[in-house]
A protein has these predicted regions:
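GH16 jelly-roll
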Residues: 3-285
Length: 285
């Protein structure tokens, strides 16, 4: 019960990194919210021809810092976003990772959130990736489960390459649609700044949204292609030829999990947007 769409993304979604210190503690950590017993799709624990090489089921009492670090800062992140990312708006509870977007005036921003990353800790190339998550919702809410090239710090974006396993934007019934996209630099790593984008989407037609229950967002990544799946149903494929443009996708990448608030693509929260908003991640494998 899905419809398929292939599209070319025209928005630029990279950022200027702000490493500034927070002036005071924002709202963060476990705020007492009881994690609902969400239903939804669960992926197999194994696949023929694959070996599990890394996972995080978020069963520890705290976020595992051997796997995850934090991006800290505001300044719009290149997309005119409205949140300030802290290390206090995410925590583990009941075997889940919870990332919370909060409405509050903080360091010149109107919202706080968290952006977790495995940069410098865990990097990956090729294989199957499954992420089981229940998404937030509302106008101006922009959750993402994505990857950047390991060499991002050296070559910057888009030369590092980017793989968006899942993006969703909230409001106007857009919570029914998942977007999967790749970003790279036209002309390869030695060319001038020339972003290129190609992605696909899948829209649920069963009356439910991606915020109603858990879904599994997946890619199967080889030297020849990247294939995107929602609940193990393929909805997009990108062939990887041997051109210099696509060379980044034959190197290691790291994960980023975040909720952005506002920005050029989703627009901004309005009176209909309810805060806090939470993304609940059951596992990544």
């Amino acid at each position: 019960q899905y419809t398929d769409t292939v599209f070319q993304i025209d928005n630029i979604r990279w950022e200027d990194t702000d490493g500034g210190e927070e002036p005071e503690d924002p709202v963060g950590g476990d705020d007492g919210w009881l994690v609902p017993n969400y239903s939804g799709y669960t992926s197999p624990t194994s696949y023929s021809g694959y070996e599990l090489v890394w996972s995080d089921d978020f069963n520890d009492s705290e976020i595992n810092t051997d796997n995850w670090g934090f991006d800290i800062g505001g300044s719009g992140w290149g997309n005119n976003e409205s949140q300030f990312y802290t290390n206090r708006n995410a925590y583990t509870k009941d075997g889940m990772l919870i990332i919370r977007a909060e409405e509050e005036d903080y360091a010149g921003n109107s919202y706080t959130s968290t952006r977790l990353k495995t940069q410098g800790k865990q990097n990956f190339v090729y294989g199957r990736i499954d992420i089981r998550a229940r998404l937030p919702e509302g106008q101006g809410i922009w959750p993402a489960l994505w990857m950047l090239g390991k060499n991002f710090s050296e070559v910057s974006w888009p030369k590092s390459g980017e793989i968006d396993i899942m993006e969703m934007i909230g409001g106007n019934n857009r919570e029914r649609t998942v977007h999967g996209t790749a970003h790279w630099n036209n002309g390869g790593i030695n060319a001038d700044y020339s972003p290129a984008y190609y992605g696909g989407s899948k829209t649920k037609t069963d009356g439910n949204t991606l915020a109603d229950q858990f879904h599994v967002f997946s890619i199967v990544w080889t030297s020849d292609s990247i294939i995107w799946y929602l609940d193990n149903v393929q909805y997009h494929i990108m062939a990887l030829n041997n051109s210099a443009d696509l060379a980044p996708f034959r190197k290691e990448f790291f994960f980023i999990f975040n909720i952005a608030v506002g920005g050029n693509w989703p627009g901004y929260p309005n009176n209909s947007t309810v805060f806090p908003q939470r993304m609940v991640v059951d596992y990544v494998r």
